[in-house]
């Protein structure tokens, strides 16, 4: 089915937190769910009298049974809060035509994270086109494993989707959207979400059901995603403060962050290679040509015939617990042997190294230049990219970036088998090569970053024509 057909965010959630038995999946929330329920929610007119569904037909993750009926829970008296009306003005002010969904960053396993907000839904008549635009924005990324965060609160009477709309949208959704979705976080769930889920539950596979995790606070979300900073709309933050009044901000003042970081680096064991500046590694580890030992080991292991041509290399997520265990061993100074380690774990270890650097490999200084890549005239891009890389990158960053690019080019050479084109590799590595100093990177910013990396991969011979020691030569 065409990915651009009707689609809606996966809104429903289970009545209780699911148990995720796969070590790769984040654990569900253990905190209590909030039962703050507004008067205006999803259109539930089809719940008590659903449209006839096909009998015993398998559709994706759903198995359609004969005439499913919802049995409403008795003695339920949810609170009818009016926070959506209170926050409506803020949500409307925040919404812009280009902000249908947000790119929130990458999680601890390097998977892209996208945020969808109920407060941004348009009226029902425009909802189908709205979600089609969301599909266009994230479709290039869903060929890889990805995470979806749905911020539930903020619906109004004129934009609440019907249960039938959700059902039809899911059935028509492209396979990659369903298959490669690894976790669906529902933030600030309500009682009605659980009712909706009970209605759909008989038709949903156990595999898909395990992907859903309830999140009751933004602190819990940050911890689950492994992101200390989340750029979220004010109305979401205000609602979180209201629902979690006892939770105080855990972020210390910037000055104390800087002091703590300096103290931590001072106490850091010289064997550390993860979570430290690249210069720190070069100064304290046996780095040949500024290449950290663990990076060289990963690249050597992944370059072997039969490994480098693995289909989906760098797309699939490796076992998170194995990756974390290897990182701890490396930071203790142990000599790790990767010969018997799964290819996706090694690939995840390499991505984790880049993501854990104290400063991105392409440096904060180049962020504005790189995010302006698509605005450059095409005839000037080669010259500008070459100058940025040769003249503005510190020597150790230049050497490591060159080393990884040359490896990724070898991965590209096997694209007939591994399906990893320059564009696919750019989507995976772009957010791990460069990110913003102060805020999360938006979809508008990630596009030029990925395009920049794609350009480098396709034009690497021209960019790296001369040796690093000759980088001071001017470029005409």
UniProtKB/Swiss-Prot annotation:
SMART domains: RhoGAP, SEC14. GO terms for cellular component: cytoplasm; early endosome; recycling endosome. It holds the Pfam family CRAL_TRIO_2. The modification Phosphoserine is found at residues 29, 31. Residues 276-464 form the Rho-GAP domain. It comes from the Eukaryota. Residues 91-244 form the CRAL-TRIO domain. Residues 1-35, 241-266 are annotated as: Disordered. GO terms for molecular function: GTPase activator activity; small GTPase binding. GO terms for biological process: imaginal disc-derived leg morphogenesis; negative regulation of endocytic recycling; negative regulation of stress fiber assembly; positive regulation of synaptic assembly at neuromuscular junction; Rho protein signal transduction; small GTPase-mediated signal transduction; ventral furrow formation. The keyword Phosphoprotein applies. Keywords: Developmental protein, Gastrulation, GTPase activation, Phosphoprotein. SUPFAM superfamilies: CRAL/TRIO domain, GTPase activation domain, GAP. PROSITE patterns: CRAL_TRIO, RHOGAP. The modification Phosphothreonine is found at residue 251. Disruption phenotype: Defects during gastrulation. Residues 257-266 have a biased composition (Polar residues). The record marks 315 as: Arginine finger. Functions as a GTPase-activating protein (GAP) for RhoA/Rho1 during gastrulation by converting it to an inactive GDP-bound state. This is Rho GTPase-activating protein 68F. The gene is RhoGAP68F.
């Amino acid at each position: 089915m065409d990915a651009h057909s009707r689609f809606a965010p996966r809104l429903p959630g289970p009545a209780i937190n699911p148990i995720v038995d796969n070590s790769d999946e984040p654990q569900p929330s253990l905190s209590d769910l909030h039962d703050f329920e507004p008067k205006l929610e999803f259109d539930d007119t089809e719940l008590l009298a659903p449209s006839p569904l096909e009998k015993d037909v398998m559709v994706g993750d759903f198995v359609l049974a004969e005439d499913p009926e919802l049995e409403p829970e008795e003695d339920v008296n949810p609170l009818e809060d009016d926070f959506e009306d209170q926050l409506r003005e803020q949500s409307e002010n925040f919404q812009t035509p280009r902000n249908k969904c947000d790119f929130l960053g990458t999680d601890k396993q390097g998977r892209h994270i996208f945020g969808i907000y109920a407060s941004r839904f348009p009226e029902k008549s425009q909802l189908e086109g709205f979600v089609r635009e969301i599909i266009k924005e994230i479709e290039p990324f869903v060929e890889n494993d990805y995470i979806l965060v749905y911020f539930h609160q903020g619906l109004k009477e004129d934009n609440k989707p019907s249960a039938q709309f959700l059902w039809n949208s899911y059935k028509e959704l492209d396979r990659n959207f369903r298959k490669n979705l690894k976790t669906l976080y529902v933030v600030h769930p309500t009682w009605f979400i659980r009712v909706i889920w009970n209605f759909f539950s008989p038709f949903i596979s156990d595999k898909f059901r395990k992907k859903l995790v309830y999140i009751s606070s933004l602190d819990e979300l940050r911890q689950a995603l492994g992101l200390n900073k989340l750029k979220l709309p004010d109305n979401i933050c205000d609602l979180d403060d209201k629902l979690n009044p006892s939770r105080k901000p855990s972020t210390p003042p910037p000055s104390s962050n800087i002091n703590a970081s300096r103290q931590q680096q001072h106490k850091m064991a010289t064997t550390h290679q993860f979570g430290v500046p690249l210069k720190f590694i070069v100064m304290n580890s046996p780095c040949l040509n500024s290449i950290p030992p663990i990076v060289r080991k990963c690249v050597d292991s992944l370059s072997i015939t039969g490994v480098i041509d693995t289909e989906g290399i760098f797309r699939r997520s490796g076992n998170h617990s194995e990756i974390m265990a290897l990182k701890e061993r490396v930071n203790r100074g142990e000599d790790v042997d990767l010969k018997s380690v799964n290819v996706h774990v090694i690939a995840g270890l390499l991505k984790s190294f880049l993501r854990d650097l104290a400063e991105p490999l392409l440096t904060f200084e180049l962020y504005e230049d790189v995010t302006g890549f698509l605005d450059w005239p095409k005839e000037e891009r080669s010259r500008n990219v070459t100058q940025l890389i040769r003249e503005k990158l510190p020597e150790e960053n230049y050497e490591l970036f060159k080393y990884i690019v040359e490896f990724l080019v070898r991965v590209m050479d096997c694209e007939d088998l591994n399906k990893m084109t320059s564009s696919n590799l750019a989507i995976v590595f772009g957010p791990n090569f460069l990110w913003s100093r102060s805020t999360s990177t938006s979809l508008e910013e990630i596009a030029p970053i990925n395009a920049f990396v794609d350009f480098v991969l396709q034009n690497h011979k021209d960019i790296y024509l001369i040796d690093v020691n000759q980088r001071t030569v001017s470029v005409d």
